[in-house]
A protein has these predicted regions:
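Beta-rich, blade/repeat-based domains predominating
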Residues: 50-65, 90-114, 132-150, 166-171, ...
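Short loop/turn segments immediately following the C-termini of beta-strands
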Residues: 71, 110, 155-157, 208, ...
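Short loop/turn segments immediately following beta-strands, especially the blade-tip
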Residues: 216-223, 306-312
Length: 314
């Protein structure tokens, strides 16, 4: 969602200065003791790599590196833990990524208005680019569901300049392994990040326009039902909006939002916030035990070791 963040990213750094404060610093803000069970008092944030345009869509590869989208430089990079990077593919406005059950890298290709998979040789293949004959808006984020299908959001946040919106709403969709596209909901203004609970019975999606997170009951073969507001992430101008999300194995929700990463328990209690020096857009669990958060935040990629284990849906 580069278009929104190009404006907000500038405000993130200007707003503190206008208030007479210095640039934002890493900080742990707990609202409940449970926060410290997930993020230790001695947690340290490390900058893995810098010098990007706008980072998004981190995915950990068990080979020991990250795939990271850069929406400004129009590339998907392999980012190594020593900070080095190499280009997997040059692609207009890549966004959220995931692996599917076949371990293929799946990307929301906003400029193509499509869901694609990118092979290890840097070639891409379109999996879906239309719903009922009309082109998607600008697919934003994608996850693998408990049934092995792909689930993705399609806001207008990165609709290519000069191109028309063909679908008259911003939807959340299911893409089956046979290529069938099913609309799940069109009630959100700008759907963005999404995730499933570890037991596969809950589906979370945030709305960047309304600054809230919704939760639905999920039933394979039936889709979503009983949607309700799970939590809200209010913030000031330039503080950021709800964006990427991940869950841990215990069902806690980690959502990038105003000032940093908001942590919620499964009951909708806001346990605390990890304040970031740069506004984060997305995050992923990584390393052999999946206890490390890798965070894409504007021009950098960061690493934060936690006390919890991430849930990996593929």
């Amino acid at each position: 969602m580069r278009r929104l963040w190009m404006v907000m990213g500038v405000l993130v750094f200007l707003a503190p200065l206008l208030r007479g404060q210095g640039p934002r610093k890493f900080e742990l803000r707990a609202n409940a003791q449970e926060f410290w069970k997930l993020v230790g008092h001695d947690a340290r944030l490390t900058q893995v790599a810098a010098g990007f345009g706008f980072t998004e869509g981190p995915v950990w590869d068990p080979a020991g590196f990250l795939y990271v989208s850069d929406e400004t430089l129009n590339k998907i990079f392999r980012v190594h833990l020593d900070g080095k990077r190499d280009t997997l593919i040059s692609l207009g406005d890549p966004d959220g990524n995931t692996f599917d059950r076949r371990r293929r890298l799946i990307d929301c290709a906003s400029a193509l208005r499509a869901i694609i998979f990118v092979s290890t040789d840097g070639r891409y293949h379109i999996l879906a680019d239309r719903y009922e004959g009309k082109r998607f808006n600008s697919p934003n984020d994608v996850v693998t569901g408990p049934d092995g299908a792909l689930y993705f959001t399609d806001p207008t946040l990165d609709l290519p300049k000069g191109e028309k919106q063909e679908i008259p709403f911003q939807g959340v969709y299911r893409l089956s392994r046979t290529g069938k596209v099913l609309l799940l909901t069109k009630e959100l203004v700008q759907p963005n990040g999404l995730a499933f609970s570890p037991d596969g019975q809950r589906f979370y999606v945030d709305d960047s326009d309304r600054r809230n997170i919704l939760v639905y009951e999920f039933t394979p073969g039936r889709g979503l039902s009983h949607g309700r507001v799970f939590g809200e992430e209010p913030g000031g101008t330039g503080d950021g909006v709800p964006d990427g999300m991940r869950v841990d194995a215990a069902g806690n929700l980690f959502v990038t939002g105003p000032l940093g990463i908001w942590i919620w328990d499964a009951h909708g209690n806001h346990l605390g916030t990890i304040v970031m020096p740069e506004q984060p857009a997305n995050l992923a669990w990584g390393e052999a035990d999946y206890r490390t958060l890798y965070i894409t935040a504007t021009t950098s990629v960061y690493r934060l070791r936690t006390n919890t284990r991430g849930f990996i849906p593929y």
